[in-house]
């Protein structure tokens, strides 16, 4: 039995890929955990997103873990993450894209319509699993050019290489979000608000305008 609510409504799926490597220790991991908490709280307070937004959280340090398997926002329980290890970001991207494809198949199996899924990536550094870079980058390019996902990469703090992140965006020319390590929690508020906007939109629309970014987040083009 698939973990899907509100079969008659159009759904939006979102995978959060979050960095829990050693450099995220201290304030950054606390900010991340608080961000994941307010993200769920905001979705659950919206009567539409409550049953139509589906969420998955994948963490990556030395290992990649699916800490929250896909579930309706109504059932989302924020994880409490700890920092340590390297930065297996490329493996996380591949895992996230696999999770999206599996969720889309579940939607199709039960006849649920869906908006283009979202992949949100947050990191404070650069990947250490470079042997998987080509695979991860190509998978993203195929998905983006095939209009199969929306991708939101975000670098936090001075150690994040936004130019490296840019290579993962559509044709290497998409936007990268940027914020300080001490103040990126609002990205999760923006993400949940934008998902709520999409979930409330006319299902026949092909494009929806998202919420404006908060002042604490900049865009690098």
Where are these regions (language model features)?
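Acidic, polar low-complexity linker/tail segments
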Residues: 1-15, 20-30, 44, 104-114
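DG-centered beta-turn motif at the end of beta-strands
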Residues: 18-21, 32, 57, 96, ...
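Short, charged loop segments at secondary-structure junctions
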Residues: 24, 63-95, 126, 143, ...
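An active-site-proximal "capping" alpha-helix that borders the catalytic cofactor pocket
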Residues: 32-45
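Short beta-strand-loop
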Residues: 51-80, 162-170
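Von Willebrand factor
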Residues: 76-115, 150-163, 182-190
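VWA/integrin I-like adhesion module and closely mimicked acidic/polar interface patches used
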Residues: 125-168
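Von Willebrand factor A/integrin I-like adhesion domains
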Residues: 153, 157-214, 221
